[in-house]
Structures are given as structure tokens and as C-alpha cells.
Amino acid sequence: MGKSFANFMCKKDFHPASKSNIKKVWMAEQKISYDKKKQEELMQQYLKEQESYDNRLLMGDERVKNGLNFMYEAPPGVKKENKEKEETEGETEYKFEWQKGAPREKYAKDDMNIRDQPFGIQVRNVRCIKCHKWGHVNTDRECPLFGLSGINASSVPTDGSGPSMHPSELIAEMRNSGFALKRNVLGRNLTANDPSQDYVASDGEEDPEVEFLKSLTTKQKQKLLRKLDRLEKKKKKKKSDKKKKKLQKSKNKHKKHKKSSSSSSSSSSSSSSSSSSSSSSSSSSTSSSETDSSSESDNKEKKEKEKRKKRKKTKCSGNKSGDCKEYKSKNMLYEELSSSHSDRGKAQEKLRLLKQESSGENSTWVHSGSDRKSRSHQHSPERKGSDRNGGSRSRSRAEGSRRSRSRSPCGQKHREREARSRPHQSPSEEQKGRKGTRSHGDSEHRRERAR
């Protein structure tokens, strides 16, 4: 149980301390080193071949001159450039002066990014902006250009190897090294299109236009002046035309506004007059429509009354006197319904129902009459009594309906209308008419019995 967590994790495949991963890393390192050695050996062989080839050329061997080795030779300027690079690489640049003669280990010889920390020497990894030396800043007194501005520092004589103190060069170097001044110090960025960047004409130089005018003759100058005058006149005319058009547009707008205001006032007056005329016409039309409707209703009522009278006469002539009384009562009901109800649709429906009932009763009365004719001698006295009782019941119903009509205000109105519509008769004439109807009904009854 005393094993650590690392011992547990190194047994995993994904952990870098596992044996399989360590083996893979070692194999990759060995492969890289083998490739490097092989490339070095090939380079050494190539260099040996080149040396032998150069020696044969110096000896004046004709085979080498007539051979195809010139195809594999590098151009003549490449060797010199390679030599210069090797010389510069030999003289490495050091940040500090004490690094030139100081001994360094093998892993730190060629790498300048490694910071040395020698014993007893203060190392500041800082570079001065003015003198471009490492180990101090422009505000330190160690700097040889301390206390001098950029202009004065540029005037100070320096070695050819040292950097220049011109402000533009200093700004460029600052940018390269990662520093930058503020915009208010640099000022406005100048552009090529800026008017301050234009060339200023010297006194000796003349404008090309002036030279062209000097080269012209007097006639040509006169023609030019005429053309210029014409162009100026055309421009003036265009301006005056534009002004006139604007004035005309403004006037037209004012006129349209006035016309619209006048038309609106006239339309309001006409609308008021039309409204008054329409009101008068509507009143007249309503009055005329009312009169027409009243006249039509009167005509319809008269026609209905005439039809009912004809029906009464025909039905009374064919049936008995008791039947005639019942028909009269039903007709009275028809008249009351038509007069009492204002809605025509409802009155018509009720009239249809009553007509159907009356037609059914007529058919029953006709059948009963025929049965009486055939079986008049066979009837028992009890049947006759029952028939009489039925007739008395129908009479009592008719009398009750008449009384209810006389009591109701609608019935009184209907009677008044009938009295107006009928011609005025004396009481003696009315009695004669009643007797005539009774005698007519009795005579018909006697004829039926005789048959």
C-alpha cells in the first residue's frame, strides 16, 4: 500500500512516464540523430569531390574541361557570398562588452537569448534609445548622450560604427524595437494629397498657361476673349432662367392654393344647399310613400271584404242556416285578425290556418248532409237529439265569439269600419234582408227532405 500516485499513473498508456511512451520518444530521437549524421557524411563526400575536381582543373586536365561537370557547378557569385556569411558569423554581436572575452558553456555559445549572470557584474537587459547600447537607459548618467536633446545629439561627432542621431531614424528604430511615441508628439500624419505637401513654384519658373498666352497672336487672343464672353453670357442666362422658373412655380402654387380654398368654400355652400334640398326631398318622399302605402292598404282591405262577401253567399246557399251562422262567425274572425294584427306576415299565416280548418269543416258538413239524406228514415230519436245538441253547441260557441268581439276594442273598430264602408240602410230594410235569408235557407232544407 506504500506505492505513490506516480507509480500508479506511469502504468497508464496516456501517461508520459509509461515505458511504452518513453520507448517511443527514445526511438524518435535516435532516428533524428541518424538522419543528421547521414546528411553530414554526404556533405563531406561532396566537398571532397569538389576539391579533387578543382585540383584537376588547376592541373589542366582536358577530360575535366570537356566533361559535363559544368552543369552541376554553382554560379560564380555564390561562393563569395557564402564566404562573407561565414566571416560575419565568426564575429558574433554581443549585448554587453564583458561578454566578448567571457567563457561560455557549449550549450550557451551560439544562443544569444540566454541571459548571463556573471559574478560581481550588474546585468540590465535594457537598451538605450539615444546611443543604442545595452545595459542602461537614456535617463541614466552612464549614457554618453545624457542631457542632450535629439537635435544636439545628432550634431555631436560620433564614430562611423555608431548609430545616427537623426530624429526620423531614431523614430524608425524605436518602432522596429517595439517602442512608439504618442500621436500628440509626432503631430498630424502627413499625406501625399495634403496641400502642404504641394510643390511651391519658384520665381524663375512661369505657369504653363502664361506661356501659352504669350505664344498666341493678337487675333487668336481676340477670338479667345469673344469665346469667354459668350460662355459668361450663357451662364448668366441660365441663372436668370432658373430664377424665373422658380418665381413662376411659386406663383402657380399660390394660385392653386387660392383656387382650392375658393372651391372648398363653394363645395361647402353647395353641400349645405344639397343637404337642405335632400332633406326636403326626403320629407316629401316619405310623405308620398306614406300616402301610397295607406292607399294600397285600403284597396287591399276592400278587395278582401268583397271576396269574403261572395264566399258567404255561395256557402250559405249550399248549406243550412246553422252552417251559415258558423261561417259568418268565422268570417268575422278573419276580419278581426286582419284588422287587429299590424304585421301582414302573421295575419296571412293565421288566415291560411283558418281557411284550412273551414275547408275541413265544410267537407265534414257535406258528408254529414249526404248521410242524413240517405238515412233520414232510419235515424233514431236519440241520434236526432245528439245532432240538435251539436248544433246548439256550435251556436253557443258562435255567440260567445261574438260577445268577445263586441267586448274587445279591435272588434269595435272593425264594426265601425264596416259601418262606414257599407251603404246606410234603414232598420226595416235590414229586417227584410234577414227574413229573406231565413226563408231561402228553409226552402232549401225542405227540398232536401223531399228528395
UniProtKB/Swiss-Prot annotation:
It is found in: Nucleus speckle; Cytoplasm, Cytoskeleton, Microtubule organizing center, Centrosome. A motif (Nuclear localization signal) lies at residues 233-247, 307-315. PANTHER family: CBF1 INTERACTING COREPRESSOR CIR, COREPRESSOR INTERACTING WITH RBPJ 1. InterPro entries: CIR1, CIR_N_dom. One of its GO terms (biological process) is negative regulation of DNA-templated transcription. GO terms for cellular component: centrosome; cytoplasm; nuclear speck; nucleus; protein-containing complex. Residues 213-451 are annotated as: Disordered. Residues 233-260, 305-315 have a biased composition (Basic residues). This is Corepressor interacting with RBPJ 1. Residues 1-121 are annotated as: Interaction with RBPJ. There is a cross-link at K79, K355 (Glycyl lysine isopeptide (Lys-Gly) (interchain with G-Cter in SUMO2)). Phosphorylated by NEK6. The modification Phosphoserine is found at S202. GO terms for molecular function: histone deacetylase binding; protein kinase binding; protein-containing complex binding; transcription corepressor activity. Residues 204-232 are annotated as: Interaction with RP9. The gene is Cir1. May modulate splice site selection during alternative splicing of pre-mRNAs. Regulates transcription and acts as a corepressor for RBPJ. Recruits RBPJ to the Sin3-histone deacetylase complex (HDAC). Required for RBPJ-mediated repression of transcription. Residues 356-367 have a biased composition (Polar residues). Residues 261-296 have a biased composition (Low complexity). Interacts with RP9, SNW1, SFRS1, SFRS2,U2AF1, RBPJ, SAP30, HDAC2 NKAP and NEK6. Interacts with Epstein-Barr virus RPMS1. Component of the histone deacetylase complex. Component of the Notch corepressor complex. Interacts with NKAPL. Keywords: Cytoplasm, Cytoskeleton, Isopeptide bond, mRNA processing, mRNA splicing, Nucleus, Phosphoprotein, Repressor, Transcription, Transcription regulation, Ubl conjugation. Residues 341-355, 369-387, 413-451 have a biased composition (Basic and acidic residues).
